[in-house]
Structures are given as C-alpha cells and as structure tokens.
Amino acid sequence: DFARSPGHLVGKLDVEAVEFPIKGAVQVNIITVDEDYRGRGIAKALYGIVLTIMRRPLVAGSSQTPGGRRNWASLSQIPGVEMKGYVRLDEEDLETDPYDSDPRWAKKAEQNIDVIMGQLGGQYIGSQPGDYYFAFDVQPTTTGKELQAYVDSNLSKLYKNSTHSHVGLYAVWTGQ
C-alpha cells in the first residue's frame, strides 16, 4: 500500500536473479506505481535505474499487463539501451547423442540451428544447463506473445515435431 504523506512511496520495482546467459541479468518480478502517479514515466524511470545506473541486463517478467507491455516497449527510447527478443531451446532440440547411430537426429539438430540463425535471424547469446539462448531484433511494440507466435510459426512450418521453446524480451545497457 502507498501511504498518503510527504515522501511516500509512489512506485516499486522488484527484480530477482534469473538464469540467463548474460552475466548479472535480473528479471522483473513485479512493478507497481500508485494510481495517482501513473502515466508520468515512473515505471520507465525504475527500469532505467536497473539498466543505466546499476548496468544490469533486465529480462521481462513471464506475464505483463497492457500497461506493463507499454512500459517495456518504452525502454528502447532510453538512449544507450537496446531491447531484444530471445528464444530458449532445450538442448535436445540442438544436440545429438554421440552414441546414437540414427543420423536423423543429427540432421534435425542442424536444421533447427539453420532455421534459428539463418531464417529467423537469431544470434547465439549463450547457454544455461539444458538450454541454449538466441537473441532476435524486435520492434519496440513486440510483445512476448507475438514473438512466441512468430518463432513457433516458423519452426512448425519446417518440423512436424515441435521444439521445446520459450521466448521473452530483455534489455541491456550498451552505453551508445
């Protein structure tokens, strides 16, 4: 709750450490702004503190309100901040078992990498145990659901077996 007194709290951003291949990344857990102060850029300023002052990569939370999506989109307007989409794929979709004699698995893994990097324009950004991450350029208005639909649609056109993917958005300080 927000108190109604001088110096009262008008906004709060709660972030938590997240398993992400970019060192120091934090994920938005919750952001809230007092109703009387909404529309004044407070949420964007809170995100900006994490990115420009703390210089921590910021990963979007798993769910967003319409207002949260607008705030997230506004991050690309902060000078020196770059916003990207990412897809996380299970290693089983990109690796083959060296002891597996079936060459179809190796071919499928190579095709998945070709689609992600070639046809979808993904850039490999790293891995966490069991997962590989690829970044994508996105428009500032792109939502996680739109990115998921785009990735799923392109992968499903080529493969009958669905890959195990998760998509999201992240922002980093580039200082440029």
Region spans (language model):
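Terminal substrate-recognition subdomain of acyl/acetyltransferases
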Residues: S5-I22, T52-Q176
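Conserved acetyl-CoA-binding loop-helix of GNAT-fold acetyltransferases
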Residues: V33-T52
